[in-house]
Amino acid sequence: MADMHEWVIAFILGGVEGLTEFLPVSSTGHMILVGSLLGFTDDKAKTFEVIIQLGSILAVVVVFWRRLFGLIGIHFGQVPHEGIGSGRLRLGHILLGMIPAVVLGLVFHEQIKAIFAPIYVMYALVVGGVLLLAGEWLKPKVPRAAGIDDLTYLQAFLIGCFQCLALWPGFSRSGATISGGLLVGVSRYAASEFSFILAVPMMLGATVLDLYKSLPFLSWQDLPMFAIGFVTAFVVALLAIKFFLQIIKRISFVPFAIYRFILAVVVYWILIG
């Protein structure tokens, strides 16, 4: 029965991770809240979260595999051009998008760990929601980058600067990068695509490091639970990414901002108040 209980927890948390990791709603906020409600907050829980993040990352790789391989010079046919100009998304765009957060993350690693608490997550949810609204309301009327291949190196770097906000637990990496993309003149769809592609090296590096640190807590007995969480996160993230890229063509990010405000109230009510 104990195993079945853990498998149910793995299925629920894997679903939460897969659904929220790439939406601008903060996967951290959801994982803290749901993990607390399920009573799953020990060292095993931290290791479990690292494992299921790999499932979410794999989903992005599956969706964008042709473009991702193309960025490193491995081509499987022609990648469709997305944009109105003659440019192409290059590896340089990804590197420029990574540099700011990597540097700040290394310099302020200990300080970031110190603010990993519900109260700071609540504040991050609110501020991130405000940034989403700002991105929608202050963005240029006509995007300067209609498609991801129109992205300039400067825009990629500026989006990377916005990504630094995601070092604040609960802010949402996708929320920060998508909002930043809107503000620097990238269309909703292109900003979302770039956010997903940028997530692969950023999340993979951080996850592998966390996994190495979690090795003492890994046990063969936990393999079924971790496998269930991994597969669930992968499948749900795959569906969430495809669904999100479709609906974002028709709706704004305002509903996501409102949802963040509601979630902040729930976090305060359940975990703080």
From Swiss-Prot:
Biological processes, Gene Ontology terms: cell wall organization; peptidoglycan biosynthetic process; regulation of cell shape; response to antibiotic
Transmembrane segments: 18-40, 45-65, 92-112, 114-134, 151-171, 189-209, 225-245, 253-273
GO molecular function: undecaprenyl-diphosphatase activity
Enzymatic class: hydrolase
Location of this chain's protein in the cell: Cell inner membrane
Main location: membrane
E.C. code: 3.6.1.27
PANTHER family per UniProt: UNDECAPRENYL-DIPHOSPHATASE
Protein name: Undecaprenyl-diphosphatase
Lineage: Bacteria, Pseudomonadati, Pseudomonadota, Gammaproteobacteria, Enterobacterales
Gene name, Swiss-Prot/TrEMBL: uppP
